[in-house]
Amino acid sequence: MSRVYNFSAGPAVLPEEVLKEAADEMMDYKGTGMSVMEMSHRSKAYETIINEAEADLRDLLSIPDNYKVLFLQGGASQQFAMVPMNLFQNGVGDYIITGQWAKKAYQEAKLYGTANAVASSADKTFSYIPDVSDLPISEDADYVYICENNTIYGTKYKTLPDTKGKILVADLSSCFLSEPVDVSKYGLIFAGAQKNVGPAGVVIVIIREDLIREDVLKETPTMLRYKTHADAKSLYNTPPAYGIYICGKVFKWLKNLGGLEAMKKINEKKAAILYDFLDQSKMFRGTVVEKDRSLMNVPFVTGDEELDALFVKESKAAGFENLKGHRSVGGMRASIYNAMPLEGVEKLVSFMRDFEEKHTAQAD
């Protein structure tokens, strides 16, 4: 069976080179006589895997020496609790609400202290990024929190907020490693792996060392303390070992491609092909303010729910999977992460053009 073009928002498409390498090593990883799935996380072989993964990630992002890299479990959603549990000193966090995931993080923070919504784009169904140049940042805020790329709604910050000296915390799950990032502008970054760098089950945290504290909220469980994992180099307990191994292979794939500058150019080209078609189409239209469009997640609609459903059905039959929009918004969404080949986007646009011609002719 031939592989489909998988436009899933996550778990998502992975580089074929990585999958083939993993398949070749499945039964015998580099002469160990066992799979990485079977390997002790305390073994020398696995120590090399996790150390190389961290080193390659540091190289890709030019992560400063005063930041720790953690490979954790619990997904990005667990970070919604870990962030306030570990960073609250005054018990106050300022949140910019640009979609469901930022909203969920905001609601979770309320369980542990005060969460302030200092800006929101909910008034227009999260179809834009609010002005973040002069936010009413709370004087006692411990941090300012953003979700930098909004998977469901297809928006992306092009300018980071002026936090007025407060720590910036960012969920980068659906744009992680899609382009260069200046890590030094953030106090803490986290990203679920299953969108752009690996399988579900791994969350990557990049945290400035001074934010790894002993004096966290007293009810914080041992496993939810960043210090626990930083001190143990992500090996306090059994990590998601195979997932980290795949992430490591993706990091090497990105380096071989030329790094994040090269990846950004490819992503911009893919996104332009799809957005250019949407802008000239008479049937399909994008749902996001143009200046805030994501390179990774492209939502679109026809304006007719029945026609949307027909498009999803016919596209699936043609080998394009997971184009149905999120259940909360409907329509369609093409997630064109790093591993989606240019050819996949070109073929999708060709299919969309044919669909439009066919159904416009039928309507006439």
Kindly label every feature range from the protein language model.
Residues 2-4, 317, 326, 330-364:
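PLP-dependent enzyme catalytic core of the Aspartate aminotransferase-like
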Residues 3-54:
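A glycine-/small-polar-enriched, mobile loop at the entrance of the PLP active site in fold-type I
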Residues 10, 109, 120-176:
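Active-site phosphate-binding strand-loop segment of PLP-dependent enzymes
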Residues 15, 193-275, 289, 361:
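Active-site C-terminal subdomain of aminotransferase-like
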Residues 33-79, 86, 100, 108:
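Conserved N-terminal alpha-helix of the aminotransferase class I/II PLP-enzyme fold
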Residues 77-142:
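PLP-dependent aminotransferase-like
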Residues 169, 183-194, 203:
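Conserved active-site segment immediately N-terminal to the catalytic lysine
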Residues 284-315:
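Conserved PLP-binding catalytic core of the aspartate aminotransferase-like
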